């Protein structure tokens, strides 16, 4: 389970365990060496390739049958069934020390009047900083003042609740004290090259001819599929309904598709296939690319304005009483926008605010709690779609618990940018079982979930995984 410990304050999660619990097993057909002919079923075209058996031995994507019958070769014999298992690279969760050490943080804070942060926020605060040649006066803007006030309100909640969960993690051995010899052995992590820019492909796909809206917008990965076009991948929801992992090869890059998962790879302007999916969802998790100064400077990924986020068709995607969860940065401007504008425009009532607290493997905050620059926590705003019609609820006889406020989700963050921890297990007491679940702006897939985004396959890249065992 991804939940290592659960207390009244919240949960201590093991993100890596959750990924590996998915059980990424690839089932391949392996012919004995005496075979006469090479058996492959491949579809090739200019920019997309889908294989049944790849030359590297990794099973690929258009077989979703759960049948255990072994196919016959040309001699009438059977191919051997070969199983290969993959796990997520554990070094991507090796966060052995804080991103900013407390000593460095303390040195940076020596010239600041820390009492102003803890003893109340005033409308105008100025700090005299003595430079090498002259004094300069730093005045906090309103956004910074609001952030200080918000931090003051939740600081003790974050500190006390996190320490309780961290202590449990240290007792159980999930978290461990950092010894000097462990830190010396750390090596730089080599990440896969972004040779296949998914977002750029989605941008190009916008110029493909659109399908008739009345057409069925779903592509099931089944054995009978004989041809696939670019339009099939980019303009349809793709499903792996089998109990096994599949692989697709896109622009020469391989991506693992977990069992019982589905996805739509598209730009925000091409969400119509998701609306034509003939499904509404009981849980919708949103991780918008919020606009901020650092994103503008880095050009690492595109961002959306509040107006663009507001235009996401949540009312058409949400089932009655749908639980909506939105990840949000610590900017008070974004928090107010969700609570005062975004959710009301979608007829969603705010019911709780939770906090994701990021720690190291030894239980330290990844940033000093009182750092004026970056905090070791992020927020989640939870809301319920308000009833507008007399439509019957799915599983209306199933009772779910009311959602408590200010719960903590404490975990070691993945070193990959914006790879959020899973919410399935922490939400299970507050949602109906066997519901329909959707993640928007997703960068990975989950069994039982539909995922959408222009980088929806990003963290499914096979290079993020390691083959750990094989057998027949």
Curated annotation (Swiss-Prot):
Entry keywords, A to Z: Chromatin regulator, Cytoplasm, Methyltransferase, Mitochondrion, Nucleus, S-adenosyl-L-methionine, Transferase
Sample GO molecular function, one term: site-specific DNA-methyltransferase (adenine-specific) activity
Catalysed conversion reaction: a 2'-O-methyladenosine in U2 snRNA + S-adenosyl-L-methionine = an N(6)-methyl-2'-O-methyladenosine in U2 snRNA + S-adenosyl-L-homocysteine + H(+); a 2'-deoxyadenosine in DNA + S-adenosyl-L-methionine = an N(6)-methyl-2'-deoxyadenosine in DNA + S-adenosyl-L-homocysteine + H(+)
GO CC annotation, single: nucleus
Compartment(s) of residence: Nucleus; Cytoplasm, Cytosol; Mitochondrion matrix
Function: N(6)-adenine-specific methyltransferase that can methylate both RNAs and DNA. Acts as a N(6)-adenine-specific RNA methyltransferase by catalyzing formation of N6,2'-O-dimethyladenosine (m6A(m)) on internal positions of U2 small nuclear RNA (snRNA): methylates the 6th position of adenine residues with a pre-deposited 2'-O-methylation. Internal m6A(m) methylation of snRNAs regulates RNA splicing. Also able to act as a N(6)-adenine-specific DNA methyltransferase by mediating methylation of DNA on the 6th position of adenine (N(6)-methyladenosine).
Protein's recorded name: N(6)-adenine-specific methyltransferase METTL4
């Amino acid at each position: 389970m991804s939940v290592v410990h659960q207390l009244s304050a919240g949960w201590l999660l093991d993100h890596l365990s959750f990924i590996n619990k998915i059980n990424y097993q690839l089932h391949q057909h392996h012919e004995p060496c005496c075979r006469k002919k090479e058996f492959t079923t491949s579809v090739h075209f200019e920019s997309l390739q889908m294989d049944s058996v790849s030359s590297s031995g990794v099973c690929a994507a258009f077989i979703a049958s759960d049948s255990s019958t072994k196919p016959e070769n040309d001699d009438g014999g059977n191919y051997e069934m070969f199983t290969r298992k993959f796990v997520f690279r554990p070094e991507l969760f090796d966060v052995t020390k804080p991103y900013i050490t407390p000593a460095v943080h303390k040195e940076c804070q020596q010239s600041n009047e820390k009492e102003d942060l803890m003893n109340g926020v005033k409308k105008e605060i100025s700090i005299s900083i003595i430079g090498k040649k002259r004094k300069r006066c730093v005045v906090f803007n309103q956004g910074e003042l609001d952030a200080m006030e918000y931090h003051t309100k939740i600081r003790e909640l974050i500190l006390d609740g996190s320490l309780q969960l961290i202590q449990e993690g240290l007792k159980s051995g999930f978290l461990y004290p950092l010894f000097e010899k462990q830190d010396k052995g750390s090596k730089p992590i080599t990440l896969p090259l972004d040779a296949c820019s998914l977002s750029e492909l989605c941008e190009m796909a916008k110029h493909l001819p659109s399908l008739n809206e009345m057409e069925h917008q779903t592509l099931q990965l089944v054995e009978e599929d004989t041809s696939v076009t670019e339009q099939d991948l980019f303009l349809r929801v793709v499903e792996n309904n089998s109990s096994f992992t599949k692989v697709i090869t896109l622009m020469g890059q391989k991506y693992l598709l977990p069992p019982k998962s589905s996805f739509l790879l598209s730009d925000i302007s091409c969400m119509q296939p998701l609306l034509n999916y003939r499904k509404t969802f009981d849980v919708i998790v949103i991780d918008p690319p919020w606009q901020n100064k650092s994103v503008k400077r880095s050009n690492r990924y595109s961002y959306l304005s509040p107006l663009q986020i507001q235009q996401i068709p949540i009312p058409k995607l949400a089932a009655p009483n749908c639980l909506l969860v939105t990840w949000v940065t610590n900017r008070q401007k974004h928090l107010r926008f969700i609570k005062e504008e975004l959710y009301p425009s979608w007829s969603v009532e705010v019911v709780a605010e939770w906090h994701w607290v990021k720690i190291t493997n030894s239980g330290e905050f990844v940033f000093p709690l009182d750092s004026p620059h970056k905090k070791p926590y992020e927020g989640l705003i939870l809301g319920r779609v308000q009833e507008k019609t007399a439509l019957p609820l799915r599983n209306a006889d199933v009772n779910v618990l009311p959602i408590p406020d200010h719960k903590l989700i404490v975990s070691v963050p993945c070193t990959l940018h914006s790879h959020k921890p899973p919410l399935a297990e922490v939400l299970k007491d507050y949602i109906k079982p066997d519901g329909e679940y959707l993640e928007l702006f997703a960068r990975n897939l989950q069994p039982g979930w539909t995922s959408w985004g222009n980088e929806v396959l990003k963290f499914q890249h096979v290079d993020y995984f390691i083959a750990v065992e094989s057998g027949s």
